[in-house]
């Protein structure tokens, strides 16, 4: 089991061996200046490779869970805010959502009180869904729009399917959950709002990769 822990005023990734209870530190990262910071809410683990993936600043890194060595898969250019990542079912790609960095326009601190959350939603930042190869050969933009995108979730069984969300106040976004076929580029509403003020969120895939 992988967990994040704050120790000695630093945030790092740790492995917990469930049978013995032994904890091992897996990363040794220096703190980053705000508005960037080290946090593993956005990390993911491959089902096919002994690797975990996480953002460190603007770098998407791969961590070998045995050798504890890291490598940089991709670097996002400045002016963007990186968000959730998820691995494809076959382990060949990491998918990520990114959006325009709004911190120069108003105060942003989502992790401490959702500061700037509503303002970011109202600003409708340009957002993208990226596909990044785990072999280090680079990444590409699959989809973009002027609406705050977050929570890219890949099907655990079907390489071509993922969901993403329109981020913002759940009861006010135009539609929370969207599906995407990364092979055809088709995008559709997974579940349209059924009544005014309805709030939908925190969607996850079932293990069959067909239902959320």
Q: Which stretches of residues belong to each language-model region?
A:
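Blade-loop segments of beta-propeller domains
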Residues: 8-54
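Beta-rich catalytic cores
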Residues: 9, 39, 81-83, 125, ...
């Amino acid at each position: 089991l992988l967990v994040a822990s704050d120790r000695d005023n630093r945030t790092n990734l740790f492995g917990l061996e469930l049978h013995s209870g032994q904890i091992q530190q897996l990363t040794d990262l220096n703190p980053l200046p705000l508005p960037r910071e080290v946090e593993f809410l956005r990390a993911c683990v491959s089902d096919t490779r002994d690797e975990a993936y996480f953002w460190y600043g603007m770098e998407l890194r791969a961590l070998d869970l045995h050798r504890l060595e890291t490598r940089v898969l991709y670097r996002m250019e400045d002016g963007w805010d990186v968000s959730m990542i998820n691995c494809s079912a076959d382990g060949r790609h990491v998918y990520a959502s990114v959006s325009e960095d709004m911190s120069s326009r108003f105060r942003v601190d989502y992790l401490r009180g959702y500061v700037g959350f509503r303002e970011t939603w109202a600003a409708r930042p340009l957002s993208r869904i990226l596909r990044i190869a785990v072999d280090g050969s680079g990444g590409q933009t699959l989809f973009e729009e002027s609406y705050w995108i977050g929570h890219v979730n890949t099907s655990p069984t079907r390489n071509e399917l993922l969901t993403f969300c329109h981020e913002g106040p759940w009861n006010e976004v135009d539609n929370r959950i969207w599906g995407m076929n990364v092979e055809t580029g088709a995008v559709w509403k997974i579940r349209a709002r059924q009544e005014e003020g309805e709030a939908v969120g925190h969607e996850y895939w079932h293990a069959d990769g067909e239902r959320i």
